Amino acid sequence: MKIQMLKAIVATTTLAALGLGATAANAATATATARAKILRQITLTNTSDLQFGIIVTGVAASTVAVSTAGVVTCGAGLVCSGTTTAAGFTIGGTTGQVTTISVPASVTLTNVALNTMSASLLASAATTTLVANAGSFTVGGTLSVGASQPDGDYTGTFTATVNYQ
């Protein structure tokens, strides 16, 4: 009886071992590669402000436009003088990477008496490719000057945003 029980244990152990071996024969392996691309943190620096210059108003509403190249166009009924510039920005980042540029559609300029004017904004490019870890763009705009616009120094701020594409 002991011999039969011993034979049964050996047979069961052998079958179990054979079963485990059969599973291992059906196994497969594959390898994968882990990758990461590190980009420099983007920096954005304002190098010049959008300057519409000195404007003498008339009795009718008109506009003053400063192109992205800084060229001024003075609307009918206005007298324009002084320095005009497009806003300038420099971008720092990783060479060869494309960046997207966005600016708000407009900015409100306000004087100390809380009188306002609105200027539409336009960036010189929607994207730029960084060369030697750098790029740049400008922002021009068209200022809407009201009829007999109250005098004063008007200012407003806007935020330009740059991201990797």
Locate each region found by the language model.
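Bacterial N-terminal signal peptides that target proteins for export
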Residues: 1-12
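Generic detector of short alpha-helix boundary/capping microenvironments
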Residues: 4, 15, 128-129
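C-terminal segment of classical bacterial N-terminal signal peptides
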Residues: 15-26
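Alpha-helix boundary/interfacial micro-motifs
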Residues: 19-21, 122, 158-159
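N-terminal small/polar-rich segments of proteins
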Residues: 26-101, 127-165
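Surface-exposed binding patches on compact interaction domains or structured appendages
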Residues: 102-126
